[in-house]
C-alpha cells in the first residue's frame, strides 16, 4: 500500500478490542509519513462516535501515530498553551480506507501547566474483563504507560516545544497554499 503524502487527507478509525468501531475522524491532514510513523493535524475535523453522535474538533491538534509504540498522541494547540491527550492503543495500521488502531481505554492527559493524569482506569478494568485482554496485553500496555511518561518527562518527540512549532508552522503553510 502506498503511504499518504504531505497534504493528503485521511480518515482515522479507532476500534475496541472486540472489533467494534469506536470513533472516526474525517479529513486529518497528513504532515509527514515515514516507514514507522505518521504525523498529521486535525483542525475543525468532524468526529463521529460509535453511537452516531457527531462533533467537530475545536482547535488545531498535531496527531502522532507510530507502528512500534502502543500509544498515540494528540497535541492540542490552545490559547493557554499546548495540552496533550495520549491514548494507550495498538500500533497503527494503514489500508486504503483509513489509518486504524485499537483503543485500550487508558489515557494520559497532560495539561498546559505540565500536570499529568492517568484517565479511565476504571473503564480499562471493566473492558479488560469483558473483552478478555490477555496478561501479555496488560503488561504491554502498562509498560507503554511508562514509556509515554518518560517521553513526557523528557520532552521527547511530540512533547518538545520545537516539535509542535515546526509541525504547526508546516500545517499553516500547507493550509494557506
UniProtKB/Swiss-Prot annotation:
The keyword Hydrolase applies. The active site is at 23 (proton donor). Pfam families: DUF402 (PF04167). It is an enzyme of class 3 (hydrolase). Mg(2+) 2 binds at residues 105, 107, 120, 123. Keywords: Hydrolase, Magnesium, Metal-binding. Its cofactor is Mg(2+). Mg(2+) 1 binds at residues 87, 103, 107. It comes from the Bacteria. One of its GO terms (molecular function) is ribonucleoside triphosphate phosphatase activity. Its EC number is 3.6.1.15, 3.6.1.6. It catalyses: a ribonucleoside 5'-triphosphate + H2O = a ribonucleoside 5'-diphosphate + phosphate + H(+); a ribonucleoside 5'-diphosphate + H2O = a ribonucleoside 5'-phosphate + phosphate + H(+). SUPFAM superfamilies: FomD-like. Belongs to the Ntdp family. Has nucleoside phosphatase activity towards nucleoside triphosphates and nucleoside diphosphates. This is Nucleoside triphosphate/diphosphate phosphatase.
Amino acid at each position: 500500500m502506498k503511504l499518504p503524502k504531505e497534504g493528503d487527507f485521511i480518515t482515522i478509525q479507532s476500534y475496541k478490542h472486540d472489533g467494534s468501531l469506536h470513533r472516526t475522524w474525517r479529513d486529518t491532514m497528513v504532515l509527514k509519513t515515514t516507514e514507522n510513523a505518521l504525523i498529521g493535524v486535525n483542525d475543525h475535523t468532524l468526529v463521529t462516535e460509535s453511537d452516531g453522535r457527531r462533533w467537530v474538533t475545536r482547535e488545531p491538534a498535531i496527531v502522532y501515530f507510530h507502528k512500534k509504540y502502543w500509544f498515540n498522541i494528540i497535541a492540542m494547540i490552545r490559547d493557554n498553551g499546548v495540552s496533550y491527550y495520549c491514548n494507550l492503543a495498538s500500533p497503527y495500521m494503514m489500508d486504503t480506507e483509513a489509518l486504524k488502531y485499537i483503543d485500550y481505554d487508558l489515557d494520559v492527559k497532560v495539561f498546559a501547566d505540565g500536570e499529568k493524569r492517568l484517565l479511565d482506569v476504571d473503564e480499562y478494568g471493566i473492558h479488560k474483563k469483558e473483552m478478555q485482554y490477555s496478561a501479555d496485553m496488560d503488561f504491554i500496555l502498562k509498560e507503554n504507560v511508562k514509556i509515554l511518561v518518560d517521553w513526557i518527562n523528557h520532552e521527547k518527540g511530540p512533547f518538545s516545544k520545537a516539535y509542535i512549532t515546526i509541525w504547526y508552522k508546516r500545517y499553516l503553510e500547507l493550509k494557506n497554499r
